Amino acid sequence: MAANDTIADMLTRIRNANMARHQTTLVPATKMTRSIAKVLQEEGFIAEISEEGDEVKRNLVIALKYKGKNRQPLITALKRVSKPGLRVYSNRKELPRVLGGIGIAIISTSSGIMTDREARRQNVGGEVLCYVW
């Protein structure tokens, strides 16, 4: 089944796998999902990313991270901000802070997909894709 909003689909799959305490989850591989997964890995929210499948139908295998004996998920929440029906843009001066800097906002900029902190450092704005904390 083709998803209209691949980012929301990815976030939902990660959220559901986290709640079920799964080790990994599969996400359809696109340029956008690869970039978002790479940012999540760099920020320490997920453990590992790999690809599987043939050329036509590739999937990202995302290994999730948990902490402690009770296996509490590192990702508390994922929230889609900019949606296909209502895009949300932010200039460099108005980039959002998530929970006072504890969480991250993932921004799609002209320089690629990056966190809000990196966008501030590079002095660029863009489309606010999602919040992760």
UniProtKB/Swiss-Prot annotation:
<comment type="similarity">
    <text>Belongs to the universal ribosomal protein uS8 family.</text>
</comment>
<comment type="function">
    <text>One of the primary rRNA binding proteins, it binds directly to 16S rRNA central domain where it helps coordinate assembly of the platform of the 30S subunit.</text>
</comment>
<dbReference type="Pfam" id="PF00410">
    <property type="entry name" value="Ribosomal_S8"/>
</dbReference>
<dbReference type="InterPro" id="IPR047863">
    <property type="entry name" value="Ribosomal_uS8_CS"/>
</dbReference>
<dbReference type="GO" id="GO:0019843">
    <property type="term" value="F:rRNA binding"/>
</dbReference>
<protein>
    <recommendedName>
        <fullName>Small ribosomal subunit protein uS8</fullName>
    </recommendedName>
</protein>
<keyword id="KW-0699">rRNA-binding</keyword>
<keyword id="KW-0689">Ribosomal protein</keyword>
<dbReference type="GO" id="GO:0003735">
    <property type="term" value="F:structural constituent of ribosome"/>
</dbReference>
<dbReference type="GO" id="GO:0005840">
    <property type="term" value="C:ribosome"/>
</dbReference>
<keyword id="KW-0694">RNA-binding</keyword>
<dbReference type="InterPro" id="IPR035987">
    <property type="entry name" value="Ribosomal_uS8_sf"/>
</dbReference>
<dbReference type="GO" id="GO:0006412">
    <property type="term" value="P:translation"/>
</dbReference>
<dbReference type="GO" id="GO:1990904">
    <property type="term" value="C:ribonucleoprotein complex"/>
</dbReference>
<dbReference type="InterPro" id="IPR000630">
    <property type="entry name" value="Ribosomal_uS8"/>
</dbReference>
<keyword id="KW-0687">Ribonucleoprotein</keyword>
<comment type="subunit">
    <text>Part of the 30S ribosomal subunit. Contacts proteins S5 and S12.</text>
</comment>
